[in-house]
Amino acid sequence: MGLWLSLCGAVVVVAYLLGSFPTGYIAVKQLKGIDIREVGSGSTGATNVLRTLGKGPGAFVLGLDCLKGVLAIALVDYLFNFATSQNLIPTTVNVQLWQPWLVTLAGIAAILGHSKSIFLGFTGGKSVATSLGILLAMNWQVGLATFGVFAVVVAISRIVSLSSIMGAIAVSIVMVVLQQPLPYILFGIAGGLYVILRHRSNIERLLAGTEPKIGQKLTTETEQSA
């Protein structure tokens, strides 16, 4: 059991490190020579990269951040497949019960890694794209439904933060409707709340009517309050 618990713990740590990989920071540093945390909203996520570098780099970072979430969950699947083939799973372990919980822990670790990166002094992004990758890997129907909510809201409002918040609210509802395992539902609730909390400054700007739409940049006054 000790070896099994160590393997599970290692997967969670690696998931955090995957989430911590600072794609947005590296992209802006390499292409523009500046620290993205010092411009715009200060976030290292795809939206701030979009405002700083444009659509191409923004889409690239979005894809990589999403991939980080997918890989974090794929690690869990790989562990169970490898451990099963090598007879490393103790007979007392119920795989059907353990796997959803470990998937959830790895997902939470990746989200925390993206927003609190060990490589950036525990700063980072708002974990939206990484969360989407996790959801798609957990259950593609949940991921697509959540992305659908995001897409509809962004098409109507042209405000990414509002769309992200609405998607975060929708996750747990979609999880319940599609009868997902309890750990996944708890992930939807906890992850959704965390993403919303990461958007506190955006919510303040939304209420004040100063949140920029796609294609607009934050004003100097807004940047200073972000």
UniProtKB/Swiss-Prot annotation:
The chain crosses the membrane at residues 1-21, 56-76, 102-122, 134-154, 159-178, 182-197. Pathway: Lipid metabolism; phospholipid metabolism. The keyword Cell inner membrane applies. It comes from the Bacteria. It is found in: Cell inner membrane. Keywords: Cell inner membrane, Cell membrane, Lipid biosynthesis, Lipid metabolism, Membrane, Phospholipid biosynthesis, Phospholipid metabolism, Transferase, Transmembrane, Transmembrane helix. It catalyses: an acyl phosphate + sn-glycerol 3-phosphate = a 1-acyl-sn-glycero-3-phosphate + phosphate. It is a multi-pass membrane protein. GO terms for molecular function: acyl-phosphate glycerol-3-phosphate acyltransferase activity. One of its GO terms (cellular component) is plasma membrane. Pfam families: G3P_acyltransf (PF02660). GO terms for biological process: phospholipid biosynthetic process. InterPro entries: G3P_acylTferase_PlsY. Its EC number is 2.3.1.275. Belongs to the PlsY family. Catalyzes the transfer of an acyl group from acyl-phosphate (acyl-PO(4)) to glycerol-3-phosphate (G3P) to form lysophosphatidic acid (LPA). This enzyme utilizes acyl-phosphate as fatty acyl donor, but not acyl-CoA or acyl-ACP. Probably interacts with PlsX. This is Glycerol-3-phosphate acyltransferase. It comes from Trichormus variabilis (strain ATCC 29413 / PCC 7937).
